[in-house]
Amino acid sequence: SKINISSNFKILEGKDAHQLLYWFNGVDFDYVDVYAMGEKGEQYMFFYTDSGYVKTDDWTDVDPNKFLKEITKNFKTSNETRKKNGQATVQNVTWKKKPYLDGTYNSVYYALNISWSDNTSTVEGSAIILGREGYTTGKYVGGDNGYQEQMLLNLSKIHKFNATKEYKDWKSGDKVAAVGIGALLATTLGVKALKPGIIAAGLLLLKKFWFIIFLPLIWLGNLFKGSDRKKKK
């Protein structure tokens, strides 16, 4: 796939992105493909999962209010690790934008308000962008200008799957994911499976999302001013 990110962003890919995220979190994020930060501190992150074609027929099972209770519990599970790494801990989580299925761009959007122990708050927006053979997860955090919903919606516009790999290109006989979009969303958020039998591979996603990984903006700004790239030594 291709991601059209403005030239105003500083971009890290692969191992460079992994190194930066590890420095500030103390946790490996070796699945990240692209990390980008804009001039005003806004942040993007993208990674792809080769799951097969994700169906959307279980979307009616999604219950945002029920999800939120478990989301809060799961985010707080990460607090012990964050404390060990000298990071602020999660105090509360609420919906900024409840999960929304966009049939035009074959994407799911949602955003969370996160309150921290240092009396700050952030908004983390996410998009699950569906393709023929899997899906791309995009994440967005606002910078100096605050959270802007249009920036979240833009995740599915600046990301383009390669020709014949878009969601609409699916054909009978192609690989189909073991779970639908509702169950995938639940797993991504760290919520219990909507129905029994969710695959173990899906549960591994919980490791990724129990940690709020977007970083203190002033530290990132200073780092990027020094160099466009920082590599692991």
Predicted regions located by residue number:
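Conserved polar/disulfide-associated segments of primarily extracytoplasmic proteins
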Residues: 1-2, 15-123, 173-190, 196-204
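Hydrophobic alpha-helical transmembrane segments
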Residues: 207-212
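Extracytoplasmic/lumenal ectodomains and periplasmic regions of secretory and membrane proteins
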Residues: 113-182
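Envelope-exposed proteins and targeting segments
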Residues: 5-7, 42, 125, 134
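Short conserved aromatic/hydrophobic patches within beta-strands of well-structured domains
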Residues: 7-13, 155-160
